[in-house]
Amino acid sequence: MSIYQSIQDFISLALQNGTIEPLDELYHRNQLLHFLGLNDWAEVDKEVHETNSLILMDQLLAIANENNVIAKGQDEFYEAALMNFMTPRPSKINHDFWEKYQASPDAATQYFYELAQQVNQVKTRDIARNIAFSHLTKYGKLEITINLSKPEKDPKAIAAAKLVKASSYPACQLCLENEGFYGLGNKPARSNHRIIQVSINGEDWGFQYSPYAYFNEHSILLNAKHQPMEINKRAFDNLLGFLDKFPNYMIGSNADLPIVGGSILTHDHYQAGRHDFPMAKAELRETIELAHFPEVSCGIVNWPMSVLRLASENQVELSKAADDFLKKWQVYSDESLQIKAKSTDGTPHHTITPIARIRDGKYELDLVLRDNNTNEKYPDGIFHPHPALHHIKKENIGLIEVMGLAILPARLETELLEVERYLLNQDNQMNEIHKAWAEQLKNEEHFTRETVHATVQGAVGEVFEEVLKDAGVFKDTQEGHEGFRKFIDFVNQ
């Protein structure tokens, strides 16, 4: 296919998705020719030959490279700017989204998600590189991923970034100002990034899809203002308010304290999507009567972390009950279990990771109790993956992992292959950090070429289960169960 046919097909897709109108076609073509380093044109078939936007993107990037129009280390920025030629303006997308919303929230999100994939805002090819498997436990089937989707920085890009003058704009990667931002140094390319403006409880928010999604239709609800995250009654109201607008999605928030929180605490945001997480499938271990909230049902979830599940048709009462649990947890201590609400200087250590969904006609809130205390034995966190597990997972346990989906580092792709070679007594370059674990596996089982891969994956799943147990404040033991009931009694006073 000729370069001009590729360009024409690219323009045809832009016409089809509403980026341009027929009267814009010549103008759009000329702008694109200049962008690709071309100054000529040959008439081609108007019938579309290639409908895959990513294949066309590759073809046009090859043209740009041949014409030397992409500066060293600028590939990511140029690629996003190229796809911006196929991405409707924010006003057009918002108009179409809310028009489709009149039919159903599902129609609106489907439109936006499909468009985000077409224009490479959601990087489907990178996401497809992730390694995924599951592991069955007594709590249900845990989901494990080795995250390979975020590409390693090219050395030229790293060198170029060092030469860029520091900028405070946008203030962070979650600010609305990222929409259409070309990119700069270590600030990602967002030329083709689009955000839906939405009002939740009278506040302005932005709704976008995550470029490197960790689960189906992984989306982010971000505050229009750059302000810190905070778990409080307003947060519960926001989660439930989002469900009123998008009942087809679940939504949750990272905790708002270091160690137990996510990687971005400086910008108020939540994460949503269409995925039935393992924790959502978990049954209740026991039910609880709430003395002060008769309209709210409650139970302890059968899960390695400490989770309360609240449900009600009454959104107002549900939010009040969640807030009551939060406030009581923020002052509750049980030092026999190393649970301590505050330091002597008043530093808070207790918060909640909340998750909201609609199930069987009721609003549901899962409240995961978090404690970020440290001590001499566990300087990274008492309720954080303990050192023996750091060879697999040492990062914070955030919202997604709390719900039973492990996001493991890319290094494990090659490191686990070396572990397999070690277990088969083959020449290997196994990282020393896996030695004790691999020795233990070797002593427990005989390995063959046919069984080693699945067995190592199962062992990784067991490590993730232990990670979640470490993060649980009330352990799944008789002592832990008794401690949990004492806390419930405190709440019911």
UniProtKB/Swiss-Prot annotation:
Q: InterPro entries attached here?
A: GalP_uridyl_Trfase_II, GalP_uridyl_Trfase_II_CS, GalP_Utransf_C, GalP_Utransf_N
What's a single GO CC term here?
cytoplasm
Single GO MF annotation: UDP-glucose:hexose-1-phosphate uridylyltransferase activity
Q: Which pathway does it operate in?
A: Carbohydrate metabolism; galactose metabolism
Enumerate the subcellular locations listed in this protein's record, separating them with semicolons: Cytoplasm
**Which Pfam families does the protein's record reference?**
GalP_UDP_tr_C, GalP_UDP_transf
Write out the transmembrane intervals.
none
Q: Under which main EC class is this enzyme filed?
A: transferase
Give the catalysed reaction(s), semicolon-separated: alpha-D-galactose 1-phosphate + UDP-alpha-D-glucose = alpha-D-glucose 1-phosphate + UDP-alpha-D-galactose
GO annotation terms (biological process): galactose metabolic process
Q: Which keywords does this Swiss-Prot/TrEMBL entry list?
A: Carbohydrate metabolism, Cytoplasm, Galactose metabolism, Nucleotidyltransferase, Transferase
Q: What is this protein called?
A: Galactose-1-phosphate uridylyltransferase
Q: Report the source organism.
A: Lactococcus lactis subsp. cremoris (strain SK11)
Which lineage do the record's taxonomy fields give for this organism? Bacteria, Bacillati, Bacillota, Bacilli, Lactobacillales
